[in-house]
Design a protein with these regions (language model features):
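Hydrophobic residues embedded in beta-strands of well-ordered beta-sheets
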Residues: 81-83, 105-106, 154
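Charge-rich, low-complexity N-terminal segments
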Residues: 2-95
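A hydrophobic, small-residue-rich beta->alpha segment in the mid-to-C-terminal subdomain
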Residues: 142-186
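Structured beta-strand/loop patches that form or line metal/cofactor-binding pockets in enzymes
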Residues: 87-144
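Cysteine/selenocysteine-centered motifs that mediate thiol-based redox chemistry or coordinate metal-sulfur cofactors
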Residues: 182-211
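Well-ordered beta-strand positions
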Residues: 75-77, 99, 147-148
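Short, well-ordered loop/turn elements at secondary-structure boundaries
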Residues: 78-79, 117-118, 149-150
Length: 211
């Protein structure tokens, strides 16, 4: 009986032990026995800034947001935009892109190395594309992407990153609104053309060619 009364008096202390300081907390933790160390909560990476990339047609190079200069195999300038083909990434993936100032997207087809397969056919990055010289272009990527499975679906990605960048002051409200409106227009256009990127762009008098 005495033992039961003692344990009943200790139970609240045992429960509260992690938050109790001084001798009471010390003895409560001793009674409970050793506890596993607290698990560190992973911290989210800081919000990023819009990624700016430059394309030098004369030099056959591109310069990414970190300042790395990479070779480009081929450029082609058309009235509706700029085409480029290049090798990117550690897996030596081959990539073809069209930078399209109107409707404000970068359309990418990636040719993966053997053993790697993507679940989508196109990625449409929502971007600001500007021609800043006779042979020089700039694309500003504000995080939103649309992954397209031809004839099946279009999925918006990156909204959380854009909102985090806006909250951190890296992107003003007008720019964030413009990116979301542009993404909505892309999704609506694709839905109206059976999720076919080529058909949607042809309806806008944009004819893409690929390797």
């Amino acid at each position: 009986m005495v033992k039961d009364k003692a344990m009943s008096a200790l139970l609240p202390l045992l429960v509260a032990a992690p938050a109790v300081t001084g001798f009471a907390g010390y003895f409560a933790r001793e009674i409970r026995g050793p506890q596993p160390p607290p698990v560190a909560t992973p911290t989210a990476p800081p919000p990023g800034r819009p990624r700016v990339e430059f394309f030098d047609v004369a030099e056959l190079t591109s310069t990414d947001a970190r300042g790395f200069i990479r070779p480009v195999d081929r450029y082609e300038v058309q009235p509706w935009g700029l085409y480029l083909a290049r090798t990117v990434g550690a897996r030596a993936r081959y990539e073809e892109c069209w930078l399209l100032p109107e409707p404000g997207v970068r359309a990418t087809v990636a040719h993966d190395s053997p053993g790697h397969h993507r679940s989508h056919d196109y990625v449409l990055d929502i971007v600001e594309v500007e021609r800043i010289g006779p042979k020089r272009w700039r694309a500003t990527d504000c995080f939103l992407d649309v992954a397209v499975r031809r004839g099946r679906s279009a999925t918006l990605l990156g909204a959380g990153e854009l909102l985090a960048a806006h909250a951190a002051g890296h992107l003003d409200t007008a720019s964030a609104d413009r990116m979301f409106e542009r993404a909505a227009a892309v999704l609506d256009g694709l839905a109206a053309h059976d999720h076919d990127v080529e058909r949607w762009l042809r309806a806008r008098d944009i004819a893409l060619t690929w390797m």
